[in-house]
């Protein structure tokens, strides 16, 4: 259990915490009873008394099977995690002296990644004197962009960051395949 999660109080822990609870037992309206009486009702039914709203006044306790409740909570958490979309960013590196056939080969891979819905970071590595005149690197990035612009969107303009010229491209929304 992580630190963020609050511990759910059950059975005797509720009796130790408070004298009275608002009891929800599935049979009609919630009613305010002594916590020991609520625990007795739960035990008579062969179930647990679970504190579902500790901050209410009085706290709300429900008669239920704690194991089943815990299982349902885990199931909901897993379902929520499945629905989260994790964006994967692939990185393709170039140099400013790259040959035409190498560009074509890398562009083919970029298009494959974009078709799968992945984001692609294009990086041109500049060495030594190339840093003084990064125009060649921008030419390479722009050439690659011209080749993939039909299947991608620019997230930003190419920019020089340290020894690299970076450009992040994402798939055009309607062109994504799974």
UniProtKB/Swiss-Prot annotation:
Q: What GO annotations for molecular function exist for this entry?
A: ribosome binding; translation initiation factor activity
Record-linked SUPFAM superfamilies = Translation initiation factor IF3, C-terminal domain (SSF55200), Translation initiation factor IF3, N-terminal domain (SSF54364)
Provide the organism lineage as a comma list: Bacteria, Pseudomonadati, Campylobacterota, Epsilonproteobacteria, Nautiliales
Q: Which GO BP terms, alphabetically?
A: ribosome disassembly
Record's keyword terms, sorted: Cytoplasm, Initiation factor, Protein biosynthesis
Q: Which HAMAP family does the annotation name?
A: IF_3 (MF_00080)
Q: Which organism is it from?
A: Nautilia profundicola (strain ATCC BAA-1463 / DSM 18972 / AmH)
* Subunit note: Monomer.
- Signal peptide coordinates: none
Q: Which Gene3D superfamilies match?
A: Translation initiation factor 3 (IF-3), C-terminal domain (3.30.110.10), Translation initiation factor 3 (IF-3), N-terminal domain (3.10.20.80)
User: Does Protein biosynthesis show up as a keyword for this record?
Assistant: yes
- Cellular compartment(s): Cytoplasm
Q: Which family does it belong to?
A: Belongs to the IF-3 family.
What the entry lists under InterPro entries is as follows: T_IF-3_C_sf (IPR036788), T_IF-3_N_sf (IPR036787), Translation_initiation_fac3_CS (IPR019813), Translation_initiation_fac_3 (IPR001288), Translation_initiation_fac_3_C (IPR019815), Translation_initiation_fac_3_N (IPR019814)
Which gene is the coding source of this polypeptide chain?
infC
The UniProt record lists the keyword Protein biosynthesis = yes
What the protein does comes down to: IF-3 binds to the 30S ribosomal subunit and shifts the equilibrium between 70S ribosomes and their 50S and 30S subunits in favor of the free subunits, thus enhancing the availability of 30S subunits on which protein synthesis initiation begins.
User: Record's Pfam families?
Assistant: IF3_C, IF3_N
What's this protein's name?
Translation initiation factor IF-3
Question: Where does it primarily localize?
Answer: cytoplasm
Q: Which GO terms describe its cellular component?
A: cytosol; membrane
């Amino acid at each position: 259990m992580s630190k963020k999660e609050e511990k759910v109080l059950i059975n005797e822990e509720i009796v130790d915490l408070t004298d009275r609870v608002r009891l929800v037992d599935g049979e009609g309206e919630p009613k305010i009873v002594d916590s020991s009486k609520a625990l007795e009702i739960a035990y008579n039914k062969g179930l647990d008394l679970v504190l579902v709203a500790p901050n209410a006044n009085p706290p709300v306790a429900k008669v239920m099977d704690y194991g089943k409740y815990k299982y349902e909570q885990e199931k909901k958490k897993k379902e929520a995690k499945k629905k989260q979309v994790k964006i994967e960013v692939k990185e393709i590196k170039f140099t400013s002296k790259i040959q035409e056939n190498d560009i074509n080969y890398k562009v083919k891979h970029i298009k494959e990644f974009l078709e799968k819905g992945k984001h692609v970071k294009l990086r041109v590595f500049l060495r030594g004197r190339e840093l003084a005149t990064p125009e060649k690197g921008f030419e390479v990035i722009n050439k690659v962009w011209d080749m993939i612009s039909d299947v991608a969107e620019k997230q930003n303009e190419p920019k020089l960051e340290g020894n690299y010229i970076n450009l992040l491209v994402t798939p055009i929304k309607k062109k994504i395949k799974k």
